[in-house]
Amino acid sequence: MSAQVLSVSLPSEIIYVSGTVNGTAYTWTLIEGAWTATVERAADDTYVVAPTAVTAAGVSTNYALTLYYGLLNLITDRTHADVVKQTDKGFYNASDLNRVGAAVQYVAERFAEQGYAVAVSPKTDWIASDIPTASELETYRQNLATLRALLSVMPTTPEALDSMAGLTYTEANSIEQILLDLDALLTNAALAWYQSGELFAGEV
């Protein structure tokens, strides 16, 4: 059974956390300021987290959030109809922020593995009650712009956004398409390196 380590940032006054991930109870431990749990890896790399946090004063709070890992769940097919019909894709919320944050982290790690210097700071544990500040949204936007600028992208790759203000469904699609394109380019670069190196030179 493969495992995945989840990490959630909660208020500093929290001293104990319990709860479930995808319906199963796990042990949570405070490590370097974040509450972590090692869980069974989900096939789709999606984790529905329902922690209960307790303060030293005995105040208990229930949280609910969804964490994403990798790129399996990126969304690029939002439509005007989603907005009009108010479907899940017609709103931009904590789930979207977490999905993109996790994908930014994943792509940044791939860049680092190929020797790129990467400076991004994605947040992946937004909860439904969070209201992002202007500064947090700018960091969110800048993370994407930073990654996109590291490579010569495809002609069809969307431009990075200039602002998160008044985000449209097409811009939301573009954010996630950029990440998919970067991932594909990194894969192609890795394959090209292997094919031009010694892997096919009969020495392996």
Predicted regions and their residues:
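Structural beta-strand segments of beta-rich domains
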Residues: 2-8
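Short proline/glycine-enriched turn/loop motifs at strand-loop junctions of beta-rich domains
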Residues: 10-16, 21-23
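Low-complexity "stalk/linker" and mucin-like segments enriched in Ser/Thr/Pro/Ala/Gly
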Residues: 23-30
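Edge beta-strands of extracellular beta-sandwich domains
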Residues: 27, 57-70
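Aromatic sugar-binding surface patches on proteins
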Residues: 31-37
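Surface-exposed, short loops/turns at beta-strand junctions within beta-sandwich domains
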Residues: 38-47
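Conserved structural position at the C-terminal beta-strand
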Residues: 51-53
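Extracellular "spike/adhesin" assembly and maturation modules
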Residues: 71-204
